[in-house]
Amino acid sequence: LRVSEVCLGTMTFGESWGWGSSKEESKRVFETFVSAGGNFFDTANFYTNGESERMLGEFVRSNRHDFVIGTKYTLTANPDDPNAGGNQRKNLFRSVDESLERLGTDYIDVYWVHVWDYMTPAEEVMRGLDDLVRMGKVHYLGISDAPAWYIAKANTLAEFRGWTAFAGLQMQYSLTERTIEREILPYARSHGLLTTAWSPLSGGMLTGKYGTGAERRTAPGSRLDNGGLRDHFLTDRNFEIADVVKSIADETGRPMGQVALAWMRHVDPGIVPIVGARQPAQLDESLASADLELSDEQLGRLDAVSRIDLGFPGAMFARAEAAIYGKTLERIDTDLEGY
């Protein structure tokens, strides 16, 4: 399956959550992305109470086979019904049929488990997803927001049973959130899974939307005008990272968001950022990051301010090399898969 270097996130399609875009503005964002060569779209049954799927389905209808549509299931559609959310088979089959109806299509290119529910057995999840593939309702499978051990367990089980395995991961990844570098990203690389990154601009933090330096601000009416999201994104550490991004943006004469996306492309060109926009100009700005090359010194500053502690056991491996290999490491071919 061939996808564009950037995925268009459509969580902003629709105004039912109070901060999205109208149908007309969403259509312009869609057309801007397609005109730039984009073919990969991300949505979910949960986004804007179904508006996102309905709009996207309408926009792609005349050329459906030209586009790669990914949607997700798991988050509840009815907080009073214990079966209206979760990874289990009942919610899976209900959700996929409702998404197909809203999208106005008879197949979904990539169907994502939105978040691990920590209850449903992996065998039930993978068997149910494989059934959807065999029925032709879904072509490829992915999982979002799950621990590496569970993804490995689920895929090993699927391969052993002859079922369809997860082909891609969707994880939060940005300069302010690098913890997938501990286990999830190495697993994806070693097993050939595509990684898509949600919130690559940290909810707008890395665009300067919420200020830098001493001039910090919240944004009433934005999606971070919410206690949980605000506390997650608007932290002292994240503002420190944004300050460094701002200094490099000033040096390059480019917007902050382009610096953040250029850093991600340098870390791993195979990571596909999911970029959202309420207006075409915002999307154009993000897409223009493709030709920005940062210097080694600038990349070093970004790494230094955002680096995470790998913890155990990751942090000990470099220290253990001499104890394992003695003086022979330089004579060993380490260009091996998984090294």
Where are these regions (language model features)?
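N-terminal binding-site loop/beta-alpha segment at the start of enzyme catalytic domains
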Residues: 1-67, 134, 339
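Short, well-ordered coil/turn segments that N-cap beta-strands
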Residues: 1-6, 37-40, 64-67, 105-109, ...
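N-terminal small/glycine-rich loop or linker at the start of catalytic domains
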Residues: 1-17, 70-83, 107, 112
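Conserved, mostly hydrophobic/aromatic
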Residues: 8, 26, 41, 56, ...
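Active-site beta-loop-alpha junctions enriched in small/polar residues
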Residues: 11-13, 44-46, 72-76, 113-116, ...
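Aromatic-lined glycan-binding groove of carbohydrate-active enzymes
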Residues: 180-221, 255
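Terminal-tail/helix-coil boundary detector
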Residues: 214-251, 266-270, 284-339
